[in-house]
Amino acid sequence: MVVNVDIDFANLYIGAVSCLNLKTLSEDIFITCNQPTKVRKVRWNGTENQLTILLINQRGDFPSMSDDFLRFLPLMRENCYICAEVIQIHVVMIDTQLNEYMMEMLRKTPTEFHRYLYQNIPWEAQLVGITGARGIGKSTMIRQYILGNQDKGRFLYVSADHTYFADHRLSDLADEFVKDGGTHLFIDEVHKYSDWSRELKQIYDVHSDLHVVFTGSSILDIEDGAADLSRRALVYPMSGLSFREYLKLFHKVDSPTYSLEEILAGKGEVTGIEHPLPYFREYLRKGYYPFSGEIGFEMRLQQVVSRTIESDIAQHANLKASTARKLKKMLAIIASLAPYKPSMEKLAVEIGVSKNNVPEYLTYMEKTGLIGQLRDDTGGLRGLGKVEKVYIDNPNLMYALSGSSVDIGNVRETFFYNQMKARNDVISSKESDFVIGKNTFEIGGRKKGRKQIEGIAGGIIVKDDIEYAHGNVIPLWHFGLNY
């Protein structure tokens, strides 16, 4: 039900509200109060003797608490009667820019395809973080959840780089959102808000019934902040599209996920396409990113690389512009030689930095999704072994950085490592290419022999250019069905 009310602030007059028996209505009532320069929205929630006034002007920001309004508020308390009961007035300062931004972003969100991580996120937990490289679909995934679950509460989606936060605090927004009945707050690109981890901690401690989900592309900043939230936040890393997801998104070919054990047993298959290899070739070139189907994919991917280095890494590590350019050069060198067997001294000389800084720069690039570092198992703990090889993170990046000069053998290894490390601990092999659990993997083309795995228990030959598994020979594309 909508009721229009004219409010003359000059005369501080209000009418039409007191004659409504709001308590007899089960639906929300929206009372819109129009003036030439302002729009006022008044909402009664239908369950309590409480009238909520949203003060919004046409610029989309808030009018100040002027003398007129301060005089108007007591008058509202005095004159708004429902069934001889005085309505409590509660002023909620929620900026319409944020609601309009959310509605516009939701309108643009595709809903036909969900990423692998969607079903694994405990969306109703109090504080959840989703991390991953730029452009892999984190924002789309959380907006899809909003679109599919609006019956579960009241949602607000914001991006931390919105101009609203230039002079508003995140914690204040959460306070007002909860007062207005908000239940789920989604904060995109949270690392772009300074002091985000402290304020999320405050929100967590103060609003135990508010569900907060945040995303971040700058994994470096997220990891630093997550240390402060270690006992509060559940943080989930997200990868780019698997080959299975690529087939679903771009070719409408559905396939289940297969565990590594099922793949090694030769059970991996895709129904709906007779010959998967042409699709696999396409995926290697431009299938890892959800924006692969857009015009100008290569240019956008180059922009992802530039922004990752110049913004995420440089700002996190407080690097000069000249040092950021050296990191770009380092990435180009790795791309031309990948899998790169690291020589810190040679790499330092090549790009003109101290040898002591090279491992740190490599770690920055690894954590922002530009490279992968394959380690041995000498560290005893995951991720602490000696770095044996450095890979570009995924084949799409290899082609974007190296073009036609890319080596297909390197592409194959990069694909295997990229797809397997999403759900498995992958370490280097002294005899072959990779070790996962009790299995040793040798990667190659159709003519790849068994020499490297002779006498090795659990040895697996992974071949490109074949469609079917036989014995311990598994098609390379099968490993793209793991998530």
For every predicted segment, state its role.
Residues I94, S217, E223-L327, L331:
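Interdomain motor-coupling "hinge/lid" segment immediately C-terminal to the ATP-binding subdomain
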Residues I130:
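Hydrophobic anchor at the beta1->P-loop junction of P-loop NTPases
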Residues K138:
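Conserved lysine of the Walker
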Residues M141:
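Hydrophobic positions on the alpha1 helix immediately C-terminal to the Walker A/P-loop
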Residues G153-G181:
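Short glycine-rich substrate-engagement loop in P-loop NTPases that contacts/grips substrate
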Residues F416, M420, F434-G449:
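Conserved catalytic cores of phosphodiester-cleaving nucleases, focusing on short active-site segments
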